[in-house]
Amino acid sequence: MGDYVTPGEEPPQPGIYRSEQMCLAQLYLQSDASYQCVAELGELGLVQFRDLNPDVSSFQRKYVNEVRRCDEMERKLRYLEREIKKDQIPMLDTGENPDAPLPREMIDLEATFEKLENELREVNKNEETLKKNFSELTELKHILRKTQTFFEEVDHDRWRILEGGSGRRGRSTEREETRPLIDIGDMDDDSAARMSAQAAMLRLGFVAGVIQRERLPAFERLLWRACRGNVFLRTSEIDDVLNDTVTGDPVNKCVFIIFFQGDHLKTKVKKICEGFRATLYPCPDTPQERREMSIGVMTRIEDLKTVLGQTQDHRHRVLVAASKNVRMWLTKVRKIKSIYHTLNLFNIDVTQKCLIAEVWCPIAELDRIKMALKRGTDESGSQVPSILNRMETNEAPPTYNKTNKFTKGFQNIVDAYGIATYREINPAPYTMISFPFLFAVMFGDMGHGAIMLLAALFFILKEKQLEAARIKDEIFQTFFGGRYVIFLMGAFSIYTGFMYNDVFSKSINTFGSSWQNTIPESVIDYYLDDEKRSESQLILPPETAFDGNPYPIGVDPVWNLAEGNKLSFLNSMKMKMSVLFGIAQMTFGVLLSYQNFIYFKSDLDIKYMFIPQMIFLSSIFIYLCIQILSKWLFFGAVGGTVLGYKYPGSNCAPSLLIGLINMFMMKSRNAGFVDDSGETYPQCYLSTWYPGQATIEIILVVLALVQVPIMLFAKPYFLYRRDKQQSRYSTLTAESNQHQSVRADINQDDAEVVHAPEQTPKPSGHGHGHGDGPLEMGDVMVYQAIHTIEFVLGCVSHTASYLRLWALSLAHAQLSDVLWTMVFRNAFVLDGYTGAIATYILFFIFGSLSVFILVLMEGLSAFLHALRLHWVEFQSKFYGGLGYEFAPFSFEKILAEEREAEENL
């Protein structure tokens, strides 16, 4: 660690600790081999192509026609897919990953898809026509049946019509405009009237048809008002549900027949029928003709049923055959399309025989990339090998962190804050341990942790089946994607629950308590006899009740019974523990920043950032941790001599919070806990508790304060001085030094010696505000001031922020205790069958509330708090997060994104 190493020369490091080393390479492909080479790179998924034609629109690129052909094939396949889903035919998806077809195979695929689409469209068109004819014939069948009844009723009512009465649907009033259809009131002779009536009936016209049931009331009203009552309307509902002849949707319809007189009314009635989208059908006048037509209609219906069944069978066979290959075809087409999209990123040389690309790729995978190019060249039959040349560049490479299904969830947690700057320390491997651990500190309960662990185990053991099921629910996908994170959170929660000795708010006496009951039974009985006395608290003095040996692992179960001071003890322990964990993680973050400074050869950052930060952190916060541990180790309940001072007992245990305040205020305090006469000082817990404490603390405070101006001004000053020296050196070199160079003419065989000023390359900077270009001192000072203030204030605020570990742990334990006391414990006070039934019922209530409130809600809360502690308190000490993600050309990724987009539609 003491030797500087440049990027690319450092010792091999697993990719999980830093992002993979990347290089920019230039790729030369023969036109004939370019398609196959890109296909092989897509299968490999380790190359990110750069767009060398950023100013060229998508419609002006070389392979735009091929992309359009792929779009058209994809459209046809989506049409086939929709038709297959419409018939509820399962599509075969074996998970097979076919190779990308050759360019010449596109013609065969296009022909296959064109044939399938045309055949299916023709079958659909024929089926639609047949269904329309079938619906029309079905409606005509119902019309012929119903109109026969109508005509029979009209024959009985003829004389009523002739006398001015209306039919069942006709309406008459005494108004002038509502006269009867035929007025023969002036005829006195019965025979003459009969003959005139028969002649009039011969002049009556009628139309018959069907109309949707919900339109019938409005249809009747408009007919009555438009025709002034001079029509005779009869309707009857069709019991069967018919398909609409236009849309094909199932609808309820009614048969109607309208009688009228004259061409004017006929025209008006037809227009009204057309307006209400009623369908009119021809209907013969005589019963014999209607009977013959009905027989013909029934015959045609039966024939249509046969033809329609055959058409549907043929359509089904076509779709079943297509369903076996449609997923594979989609995969092939999408691969072809992605290849041509990638080829559009290439430059084409002037000879049109070579394609040039620039790619980002991992240095460790160059051999595999070259092998893929060789396979592509061999498969294409090209005699010219493909060339991959590494390039020098000042551009920041993309960040590529290798992951697997276990580490992916933790890497996503880190990347959600920001993609790591190229080659800086990756927090993910440390997050794998610290994240579930800090979560468990807040969530610690063996019972709830076991529930979480079992749920995660289910997702892990059934992951293949669950992946194959392709469940689209977003909440499920969130839990399933983080199954390994949940698994570790559950495992660590069981561990911290064991440390807290907490199982559903209860403790387990595994090793035997270190406390003994020293209270006589007579005293206990005395307190239990009287209700008021029973509310008093019995105290176990540690001098007599504690055997001096701590509980082997975790918290002594006796504290679960200590109603009076249980919270005081646990709060003090968890509060100090939170501070220890927080300062330890922050210190580790600062140490990781040293690794970054070493890697990037930033000596100024090491001298004037890392070292002052460690001194500042150690002078105050690490010193506080030492005090916490010392208090736990040396200051017990029993008095004695501690660190050279006489210690009277627990009442003189030092107060660390007030002591820290006095340290900054440099307040004078008593040395030790007792005076020379052996009397205990009043407020002895405020005294100094080891020799030389006051002097040491003054030195630490001064040392911490001195680091602030060092962090603020030292680095900008040395950057400024370095910049001045480089500027002076460049000026002197430009004025005094010249060098000779050779200018050659490629069209002639001679050359000349010329003189030109030497160009001094600018140093590459490794810090903020320096490097290429002039140094802007204002920007450097502002940047340095922001980071200094952020670190100094952050050390205080972040330490306080870690107290959320204590707060959430307390809240979780108290909520668990309330749930046990208020719900499940009530079942234990009942005896017999009533108690058994109550226990059965209350257990399910208790279990449901535990899962939904304590596991899910409290678990989500602890998860978010752990997320904040890592993003802000931990990663702010060393993590830049200013990089961009490596996005390789990968068929697997492209197909997965397409599948996800389909499922979200």
Swiss-Prot record:
Record's GO cellular component terms: membrane; plasma membrane; synapse; vacuolar proton-transporting V-type ATPase complex; vacuolar proton-transporting V-type ATPase, V0 domain
Tissue: Ubiquitous expression in embryos. Expressed in gonads, intestine, neurons in the head and motoneurons in the ventral cord of larvae and adults. Expressed in the vulvae and spermathecal uterine valves. Weakly expressed in the pharynx.
Compartments, record wording: Membrane
UniProt note: phenotype after gene disruption: RNAi-mediated knockdown causes embryonic lethality at the 100-cell stage.
Transmembrane segments: 425-443, 446-462, 478-507, 573-592, 611-631, 700-719, 789-813, 835-873
GO MF annotation list: ATPase binding; proton-transporting ATPase activity, rotational mechanism
InterPro entries according to UniProt: V-ATPase_116kDa_su (IPR002490), V-type_ATPase_116kDa_su_euka (IPR026028)
Lumenal topological domain: 444-445, 508-572, 632-699, 814-834
Keywords: Hydrogen ion transport, Ion transport, Membrane, Transmembrane, Transmembrane helix, Transport
Pfam families: V_ATPase_I
Keyword Transmembrane in annotation: yes
Entry membrane topology: Multi-pass membrane protein
Keyword Signal: no
GO biological process per UniProt: defense response to Gram-positive bacterium; embryo development ending in birth or egg hatching; locomotion; negative regulation of locomotion; nematode larval development; positive regulation of neurotransmitter secretion; positive regulation of programmed cell death; proton motive force-driven ATP synthesis
Topological domain ranges for the Cytoplasmic compartment: 1-424, 463-477, 593-610, 720-788, 874-905
Role according to the record: Subunit of the V0 complex of vacuolar(H+)-ATPase (V-ATPase), a multisubunit enzyme composed of a peripheral complex (V1) that hydrolyzes ATP and a membrane integral complex (V0) that translocates protons. V-ATPase is responsible for acidifying and maintaining the pH of intracellular compartments and in some cell types, is targeted to the plasma membrane, where it is responsible for acidifying the extracellular environment. Required for assembly and activity of the vacuolar ATPase. Regulates the size of gut granules during embryonic development.
Family to which the UniProt record says this protein belongs: Belongs to the V-ATPase 116 kDa subunit family.
Assembly information from the UniProt record: V-ATPase is a heteromultimeric enzyme made up of two complexes: the ATP-hydrolytic V1 complex and the proton translocation V0 complex. The V1 complex consists of three catalytic AB heterodimers that form a heterohexamer, three peripheral stalks each consisting of EG heterodimers, one central rotor including subunits D and F, and the regulatory subunits C and H. The proton translocation complex V0 consists of the proton transport subunit a, a ring of proteolipid subunits c9c'', rotary subunit d, subunits e and f, and the accessory subunits vah-19/Ac45 and vah-20/PRR.
Name of this protein: V-type proton ATPase 116 kDa subunit a 1
Lineage summary: Eukaryota, Metazoa, Ecdysozoa, Nematoda, Chromadorea
